[in-house]
Amino acid sequence: MIQENIRISVIVAAYNIEEYLVRCLDSICNQTYHNLEILVVDDGSTDETGRICEEYAGKDPRIQVIHQNNMGLSGARNSALKIATGEYIGYVDGDDYIEPDMYENMLDACLENDAQLAVCSYRQIGSEKAQ
């Protein structure tokens, strides 16, 4: 495992996804790499998304919540990007969840290859399609 002196800002855009958000945030909070700044943007949700965001922020000091009027995915991401302090930026959609070692593996790959960007594949759950 690499030294945890590099901060990764993880940006989560959330709009009316109360049924998925807990699993998403749990998957980020439980990463094997811990030096994360987690920026969750409640993009004008009308369900319990905002409350769930605040609940998680109260439990984990790495989480900051931004509440804003609905600006769409790009607007939500850009709002968080303005305040992000990490040396690397990661994006997780609020209705997705990630493997426990995703950010550790991606950062390792960046450092080993002197890369400024890492991308990964995804698996579509509940469907026969996988990318």
Enumerate the predicted regions with their spans.
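Nucleotide-sugar donor-binding/catalytic module of glycosyltransferases
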Residues: 1-131
